[in-house]
Amino acid sequence: TNDSAQPWSKEEKLKWICPVPGYDRHFAITEQFGFELVTVPMEEDGPDVEAVEKLVADPAVKGMWVVPMFANPTGAVISEDKARRLARMQAGAPDFRIVWDNAYAVHTLTEDFPEILPILDIAEEEGNPNRFWAMSSTSKITFAGAGVGFFGTSEDNLEWYLEHAGIRGIGPNKINQLAHHEFFGSAEGVRAVMRRHAALIKPKFEAVLRILDKRLGEYEVAQWTNPKGGYFISLDVVDGTANRVWELARDAGILLTQAGSAFPYGQDDNDRNIRLAPTLPPQEEVEAAMDGVATC
């Protein structure tokens, strides 16, 4: 980064903080680039900041993933207090960065849109303006992999980034940018589209929650999240059984996300977590599948 004494590739040891359960593609990226992935628990209001504060004292820790709103897979929304603590904390590495991936910023399942924290302003106020790389896109709004991406950070970081981005390519697809602008028209236009998204997928989430509660609620053999937005439900089963539940479901013709996939290296030490993704299948398939999962 622009605050680094040398490229990270020349460092002897590199570490990256990963809140868990979290997003497997995030973990795959940092693993591919040679980082040792260290985990912290994801709580209802964001990552366990006390655990983060201890880890970042190590100068080998160069960064951290954060999905601040409707996090994958728990649906957690970070509190302003935790955001400020992440911005304020002392890091052993002067070039420590937080990738603030706001992929689900407007992906509500209700009529309400939570406030989007002004994380760059918070970073400035807390004395670490270069700490955050804020990102988002319309991949889960318009076209998967072919929407419009966003990158926000400090002016110093942007200057450094543009020096490198200018080598990679002349510029983004401005026709696609214009098409998105014309389609949405305004921020309220985005919210209107996302309310329509919610109308399509909310019944599927309700079905999952209803079946889990009906089939498993009284037995205390599982816990699950009740997200207000995002695309996933996080299911925790009895410790040591998640892979077996996944296998039984597979044998019954139900394809779930691999148990442990929400953890770095696919290793859930407690073997308890399964990420449920009900958005794609038709309603009747979601209900049939969840009835089968509850049986497993």
Across the structure, where does each feature detected by a protein language model lie?
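Conserved core segment of the aminotransferase class I/II
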Residues: 121-202
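Conserved core of the PLP fold type I
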Residues: 1-94, 105-127, 294
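Walker B catalytic acidic pair
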Residues: 102
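Conserved glycine-rich beta-strand-loop-beta hairpin in the small C-terminal domain of fold type I
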Residues: 195-209, 221-236, 250
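Short hydrophobic/aromatic beta-strand micro-patches
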Residues: 152, 234-236, 277-279
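PLP-dependent enzyme catalytic core of the Aspartate aminotransferase-like
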Residues: 128, 251-252, 265-296
